[in-house]
Structure formats: structure tokens, C-alpha cells
Amino acid sequence: MFGFDNLILGVYLFNFLLILTATYTDIKERIIPHFVIILMLIVNLPIGYYFFGFDAITSFFATLILCLILGVGMGGGDVKMFTALSPLFAAETIYFVPKDISILIGLSALFAAIFPMTKILKNYWKDIIPSSAYLAMLIGIIVSITEIYSIGNTKTILWSYIILSIFISRKIPKYRIISNKLGYITPIYLIGFYLLNPAYFVSENVLISFFVYIGQLSLISLVIYALTGAEISSKKQISDLKEGDIIRDIVTIKENGEVTVENANILKRFKHMIYGEMGKLEGKSLMTDGEGLSDENLELLNKLQNEGKIGGELNVLTTYPFVPFVLVAYCVITLLNMGVINYLVG
């Protein structure tokens, strides 16, 4: 007779292999095979019921409902996978949804959001790092002055300027060039600071704080760059578009039959969506953030192209398979449950 630890370890490993298989097919073909979900259900439901009783069943249905509610941007295969895993994690639940499944969904979404940021950093690091160094230097100077001379209520104004500065650098090239050049003098700032006030430099960890600020400002810059149009996209022929593709363009069909195509960043698309919900837009708009293109959308675009109302290609956002991020998050959850991470950290 298997003990709890051996049996649960075996099931964890079995599910890992299934998710690994789904990761391969998701990368290659953007599908999750049915046999993966079926095998998960065949194993996880009985094992979950054996250990956790009826809680495993309620967790199954509660997770299904949660995934359907959060389903914008989540494919049907992802919903099935999270649901099929849920009976295995029914030991602790929040409103009948396993706590570990909630963390698994959250971590998967977080990893999926962070990964595209690495692409933006790869493309724009020559702007982001120097300007972040300049802003970190500015923060260090102002913070030290306010602390030495006991000046209060400056943080809100300072960080407001920092965020505004990053936005301005995206819109005004000359300002961005100046910010970048100022970033290269930060070594002089650090050396000069140490020579002027070595006691404060050491006691307040100015050097460490400087690099922490650079990290924080780089992350803020990545988010602002993404919001202001640095999303990774490519042009694609309308005839090559597939169901699920997310177009960056806003296609608007006006009441007089005129069609406009606007290459819009995420802020413009969000604003357009809000205006649409408020009924402030003229005509009908096609936006695919979240769920992607449907068969009806593809038919409409091909019709508009055949009628000569739009060009032959649109800007399509680069998206990534979701299951690889689920695999990483699953490894984190299982290692935590097995105490491996706590052992390594502790």
C-alpha cells in the first residue's frame, strides 16, 4: 500500500509529464491534446476523492466556474487543464476553489505577462537602462537632500515627475537623448557623493539604493513602454490570419460605409473600448484584445479586403503559448507543497 507522500509524489510527477507534453504541442501547434486532459481527469478525480473526499468534486466544479469567469484571454484547453488539476489540490480551498489552483492561475498569468517584457527590454535596453540610471541619480540626490535637511512631503511629487519623465521620453526624442546622456555620468555622481559625504554614503547604503532604484525604474519603464506602443507585433496578410490572432489595429466601419484602420497602442485600444461601451463611437469597431479573431471576424476582414475598403495586411500582436507558463507555475506549486523550496530557502 502506497503512503500519502509516495502516492501524491507519483501523481505530481504524472501530471508534470502530461503538462510537459501539452507544452510541446502548445509550442508546436498551439493545441492541448484531448488525451492529456482525459488522463488528468482519470487520475486526479479518483486520487483527489480518495484523499479529500467530496471537497475534490466541489473544487472541480468551482474551478471550472472560476476559469469560465476569468476566461477572457484563456483558451478552452487552459480552462480544462486547470479544472482537471483542481481535485489534486483540494486540501485547502477559498470559496471552494483550491488555494493552490488560484495561485497556479495567478502565477501562470504573471509569467505570461512578464515574458513579453523581456522582448521589450531586448529591443529598448539602450534607452531604458541609461534613462533609469539618470532618474535613479535624480532620486538619490533629492532623497539625500530631503533627509539631510529634514524636508518632507516630496516623494509624491518626485515619483510623479519620474513617471511623467518616462512618458515624455517616449514622445519627445530629444528629451530621451538628453536623459540617456545624463545616465552615463552616474559613476561621477556616485564617486562625488562618496567624496563629499562618505559617512552618509555608507550608513544609508547609497550605492545599493542606486541599483535598487535602477531595477524599479526599469520595470516601470517596461510597463510604460508597453502601454505606449512598444508591444511586439508584425504585419500579416489578411489571408494568412487565423482564429485567435490578436490584431493591434482598430478597424472601424462607419455608418456611411467608410472603413478606417488605425494602428493603436494598448492605451488607445482601451480608450476606444471604453468609448464603445459608452456609445460614443460612430459605426462598428473590430477589436480583438483578449479573445482574438473569431471566424466571423475573419470573414468580415476578407470581405472588406475584397471590396477594396482595407489593405491586404494588418498589424498582429506577437503572442506566446500559455501552457509553458503553466508548467513553470506548476513546478513552483508542487515544490512548495513538497517543502523543497522552504528547505532550500531555510
UniProtKB/Swiss-Prot annotation:
It is found in: Cell membrane. Its EC number is 3.4.-.-. Signal peptide: none annotated. It is a multi-pass membrane protein. InterPro entries: Pept_A24A_C_arc (IPR009639), Prepilin_IV_endopep_pep (IPR000045). Keywords: Cell membrane, Hydrolase, Membrane, Protease, Transmembrane, Transmembrane helix. GO terms for molecular function: aspartic-type endopeptidase activity. GO terms for cellular component: plasma membrane. The chain crosses the membrane at residues 1-21, 31-51, 56-76, 77-97, 101-121, 128-148, 149-169, 182-202, 206-226, 321-341. Belongs to the peptidase A24 family. Peptidase that processes the N-terminus of prepilins. Specifically cleaves proteins with a class III (type IV pilin-like) signal sequence, such as the major structural pilin EpdE and the minor pilins EpdA, EpdC and EpdD. Is not able to cleave the preflagellin subunit FlaB2. This is Prepilin peptidase EppA.
